[in-house]
Amino acid sequence: MDIRAAEISAILKDQIKNFGQEAEVSEVGQVLSVGDGIARVYGLDNIQAGEMVEFENGTRGMALNLETDNVGIVIFGADREIKEGQTVKRTRAIVDAPVGKGLLGRVVDALGNPIDGKGPIQATERKRVDVKAPGIIPRKSVNEPMATGLKSIDALIPVGRGQRELIIGDRQTGKTAIALDTILNQKPLNVAGAPEGQKLYCVYVAIGQKRSTVAQFVKVLEEQGALEYSIIVAATASDPAPMQYIAPFTGCTMGEYFRDNGMHAVIIYDDLSKQAVAYRQMSLLLRRPPGREAYPGDVFYLHSRLLERAAKLNDDHGNGSLTALPVIETQANDVSAYIPTNVISITDGQIFLETDLFFQGIRPAVNVGLSVSRVGSSAQTKAMKKVAGKIKGELAQYREMAAFAQFGSDLDASTQRLLNRGSRLTELLKQPQFSPLKMEEQVCVIWAGTNGYLDKLPLGKVRAFEDGLLSLLRGKNVEILNTIRESRDLSDDTAAKLRSAVDGYAKTFV
């Protein structure tokens, strides 16, 4: 066989020309210094802000500071294995997380990796964790209630779907307990076969908490059958600051999946004070200039861009909603500190919890005078509006009178009556943990309180009266509850039936 030299050289040239084209080209940099969860990297000239990078040992990081001669990278993991001179690779992807219904019932870390030992996540989609909030046009005003199951909140400080309601108070005042009860209260809505428009999925983000606390929280949800419609995102106290900083954004992205697909979700950030502390730590280590209380200048933007993502969308955009319940821990009831005032100004109201009330046995320890809901009343059902209006006024008068009553002992009959009614209503608003009430049950109980059925009872008997009344309504008089639930109103006819039922019960109650 005759082979010409020209042919050989042509084949060789062709192969040489295409040699190595299938090789992967990746932009790499070099670690200049590393420590305290921060790496300074030389190179990576075309990196984007917020881009994910990968170190030699597989640890991930995020580019936060883009400077003239180096890049400041925060490390999502331990920095012990990372050494000076090692290479760092760009991933060309902004930090993202898995989303979808496959996450329900799972516990994940701040990057969406499972940490509950139940195998890989069944999620088909991934979304960026830090995206722009919906604009003005896709939104609509809050008009559906988001029931917490707690009488003092649903009647006096109502929360609507798509609202942002802050839970604020000192340590050990029951902030997480309110969040937990809210999740448990969604169980009747999330029964199998219920319409998607009714269901409310829950996302709980634990930031900087003890692992034992998170484990206990998950255990309660599992025991009560509430884990199946919940997602837990945990960045515990032992996790690096960057993980605690990114966790709320990851949780928010998971909640947004439901909002954008015409479903409803509630997200609880527990708590944002610890996220601000983690962000302050990162910013100071990146040598960004400190501001008030040594927080960086953009700590307001950190929380506002997160909380603005909670929204009620209009019909053209699927009618979905994401409700946010951020938690803030105060020091000695100081709500005028930097982070509390920031978050109060961003949210649509706050539930203010007080240590003194907690120790007096008023639990949930909600200070009804300082707590407000700026948009929730438009989401209240007609039935609740009718009974709540009266209790609000009576409690406000009671608080005013109680302050004066401390000075004088000889009070006239009307003042005495007012104080008597107020103390009974305060007793009525107490509620043990893990026992949320349905809207129609709350309406009946509060109606009985504001119509004077508790006035002659000793304080210690109020709880027993309430429990007995609820048993009666759930048993013999269940049609009253059904009518209120279906019509969402307390008509004169239903009120008359309720009056005769409560009259009959009050006569037999001893």
UniProtKB/Swiss-Prot annotation:
Membrane topology: Peripheral membrane protein
Ligand binding (ATP): G169, D170, R171, Q172, T173, G174, K175, T176
GO molecular function: ADP binding; ATP binding; proton-transporting ATP synthase activity, rotational mechanism
Keywords, ordered alphabetically: ATP synthesis, ATP-binding, Cell inner membrane, Cell membrane, CF(1), Hydrogen ion transport, Ion transport, Membrane, Nucleotide-binding, Translocase, Transport
Residues the UniProt record annotates as site (Required for activity): S371
Enzyme class: translocase
EC number annotated for this UniProt entry: 7.1.2.2
InterPro entries: ATP_synth_asu-like_sf, ATP_synth_asu_C, ATP_synth_asu_C_sf, ATP_synth_F1_a_nt-bd_dom, ATP_synth_F1_asu, ATPase_a/bsu_AS, ATPase_F1/V1/A1_a/bsu_N, ATPase_F1/V1/A1_a/bsu_N_sf
SUPFAM superfamilies: C-terminal domain of alpha and beta subunits of F1 ATP synthase, N-terminal domain of alpha and beta subunits of F1 ATP synthase, P-loop containing nucleoside triphosphate hydrolases
Reaction equations catalysed: ATP + H2O + 4 H(+)(in) = ADP + phosphate + 5 H(+)(out)
Subcellular location as annotated: Cell inner membrane
Entry-linked PANTHER family: ATP SYNTHASE SUBUNIT ALPHA, MITOCHONDRIAL
Family: Belongs to the ATPase alpha/beta chains family.
Function comment: Produces ATP from ADP in the presence of a proton gradient across the membrane. The alpha chain is a regulatory subunit.
Subunit structure comment from the entry: F-type ATPases have 2 components, CF(1) - the catalytic core - and CF(0) - the membrane proton channel. CF(1) has five subunits: alpha(3), beta(3), gamma(1), delta(1), epsilon(1). CF(0) has three main subunits: a(1), b(2) and c(9-12). The alpha and beta chains form an alternating ring which encloses part of the gamma chain. CF(1) is attached to CF(0) by a central stalk formed by the gamma and epsilon chains, while a peripheral stalk is formed by the delta and b chains.
Protein name: ATP synthase subunit alpha
